[in-house]
């Protein structure tokens, strides 16, 4: 694995740390259901706090949130969907007796999920990876790709430390992944 600076030095080290399965795209939801199970596998190492996740919404979001709930149910992801302003208020007052928000007409309560401390959890992933044979090279900047002579297949990664020959490349750069192919 190549790391431009250090583990958790970028967005993963400062992101909000929320672990949830509240996504509108079905494929993302299945991936996140698996991801939540990874967090649950070692909460101590990941500094993971399984407190659940609430999406509290006004009427304008009701239909979309209902769709998310149905898709969660279809993959066996435990959640509860509360509808109607009165029922939503009662549900929230059951958790927070001083609840006062108005205009809430739906609540999606994911029973799984929660939050983790960012850098600690990413460092735990680093430790688990290296203990399973992953080599992490830090301080390596990717400059481009070496391509096969008769194809566009990637045969190496060009870095500021030289070229690394390879058979496969996996880009794990989050929303910046597209930049590697441009």
Give residue spans per PLM region:
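Dinucleotide-binding Rossmann-like beta1-alpha1 core, especially the glycine-rich loop
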Residues: 16-98, 104
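Short glycine-/acidic-enriched loop or helix-start segments at secondary-structure transitions
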Residues: 11, 65-66, 147, 180-182
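Short hydrophobic segments within beta-strands
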Residues: 2, 56-57, 172
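Glycine-rich FAD pyrophosphate-binding loop
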Residues: 1-12
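Short loop/edge segments at beta-strand edges and connector loops
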Residues: 3, 83-84, 138-140
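Glycine-rich nucleotide phosphate-binding loop and flanking beta-alpha elements
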Residues: 8, 62, 176-178
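Helical element adjacent to the flavin cofactor pocket in flavoenzyme catalytic cores
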Residues: 108-168, 172-179
